[in-house]
């Protein structure tokens, strides 16, 4: 705010490697911090210790990474500044640095890039999502993050492709970080490409991914995030139930799974399950009882209303049967009722003890190989025969 030394009326912020950006409510941009490559966009390479107003106007989003920044206007144009030796600014050349904001070019280099609705920056590459739901990328590609099937670095935008070599379409949102690229489609499928040394591509391996490849998940994905590190990278996604899955580098506990050790297999750190009012049900033989399970969200980030479609299964129908949520004791002993919701991939169980009806057991005699066991009507057990193993 003028004269106070404080910024106000800010609607969005962004952090690069060592640089900060703030967008005001009217679309102006202030930036400050490390500026060796001109990533602040004020016409010089002097590091700024206080916010400086830039020439940008009508800005709705800024994405910044280690040494470059990309700004998106309300009308879908893209401005870039900073490091460009790998072509990440998409201006048709590899000029080492750009100190003033200038417009990104279209893939054919015949005009400025237009009709963009989201931008994302990795360490040395940039992704853009257009209004027609297609994705383009430019910049460093040695680890295949441009998803064009090559390792050729580009200085102009190029369409990103899926594993069938088709240009990816129907895209809802994009994310870039380090040497990785991620997209989520309108039907909540997650695709990834790029460097995969710690399994950060969610593919259950550590092989680099050359084209956007679908990630196998049980239900739809809502959001994706990854650390900005190009090497020791950790990634996470949130599914439609709000459950969080993490993968990748874990040298300092980044995965949140209570372990120290990296993993290329996604792990849920959300304790989502089906729980019953009573985890242990005691019933008598010949009687019934009801169980009333509920969905326990555990640690989640999205509080969506969940429609549960439960299925019940007795693991030993000689002891107890189940119909809907009603358990019937048919034998004597202990079993479990498995509760599942295959739509949302959540599960639970209830332990069931079936006791003697009215204290009167049904007499029964059973035989082993060399010994016998008898259950008397008073509920006592008698044994006889070979006892070499304490049977």
What would you call each of these model-derived segments?
Residues 11-14, 24-30, 37, 57-63, ...:
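Tandem repeat domain/solenoid detector
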Residues 192, 236, 243-247, 260, ...:
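An edge-strand/N-cap motif at the start of beta-rich repeat modules
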Residues 19-22, 31, 68-71, 80, ...:
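Conserved core positions of repeat-based scaffolds
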Residues 4-8, 62, 110-114, 165-169:
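Short glycine-/Asp-/Thr-/Trp-enriched loop segments that recur within the blades
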Residues 46, 57-59, 96, 108-110, ...:
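Short coil/turn segments at the loop-to-beta-strand junctions that recur within blades
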Residues 1-3, 30-50, 79-104, 136-158, ...:
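Short glycine/serine- and acidic-residue-enriched loop/turn motifs that recur at repeat junctions
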Residues 271-362:
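Extracytoplasmic soluble-region selector
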């Amino acid at each position: 705010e003028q004269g106070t030394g404080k910024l106000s009326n800010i609607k969005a912020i962004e952090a690069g490697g060592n640089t900060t950006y703030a967008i005001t409510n009217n679309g102006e941009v202030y930036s400050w911090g490390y500026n060796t490559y001109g990533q602040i966009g004020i016409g010089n390479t002097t590091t700024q210790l206080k916010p400086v107003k830039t020439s940008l106007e009508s800005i709705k989003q800024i994405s910044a990474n280690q040494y470059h920044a990309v700004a998106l206007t309300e009308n879908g144009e893209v401005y870039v500044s900073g490091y460009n030796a790998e072509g990440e600014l998409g201006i048709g050349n590899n000029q080492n640095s750009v100190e003033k904001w200038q417009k990104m070019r279209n893939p054919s280099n015949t005009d400025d890039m237009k009709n963009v609705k989201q931008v994302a920056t990795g360490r040395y590459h940039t992704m853009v999502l257009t209004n027609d739901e297609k994705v383009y990328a430019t910049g460093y590609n040695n680890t295949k993050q441009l998803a064009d099937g090559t390792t050729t670095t580009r200085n102009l935008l190029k369409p990103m492709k899926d594993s069938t070599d088709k240009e990816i379409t129907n895209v809802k949102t994009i994310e870039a970080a380090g040497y990785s690229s991620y997209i989520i489609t309108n039907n909540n499928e997650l695709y990834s490409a790029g460097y995969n040394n710690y399994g950060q591509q969610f593919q259950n391996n550590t092989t680099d991914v050359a084209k956007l490849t679908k990630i196998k998940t049980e239900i739809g994905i809502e959001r994706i995030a990854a650390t900005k590190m190009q090497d020791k990278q950790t990634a996470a996604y949130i599914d439609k139930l709000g459950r969080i899955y993490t993968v990748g580098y874990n040298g300092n506990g980044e995965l949140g799974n209570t372990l120290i050790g990296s993993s290329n297999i996604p792990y849920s750190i959300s304790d989502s399950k089906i729980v019953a009012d009573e985890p242990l049900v005691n019933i008598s033989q010949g009687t019934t009882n009801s169980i009333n399970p509920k969905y326990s969200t555990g640690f989640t980030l999205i509080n969506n209303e969940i429609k549960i479609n439960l299925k019940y299964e007795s693991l030993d129908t000689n002891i107890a049967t189940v119909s809907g949520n009603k358990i019937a004791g048919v034998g004597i002993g202990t079993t479990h009722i498995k509760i599942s919701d295959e739509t949302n991939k959540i599960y639970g169980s209830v332990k069931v003890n079936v006791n003697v009806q009215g204290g009167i057991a049904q007499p029964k005699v059973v035989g082993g190989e060399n010994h016998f066991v008898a259950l008397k009507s008073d509920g006592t057990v008698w044994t006889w025969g070979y006892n070499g193993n304490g049977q």
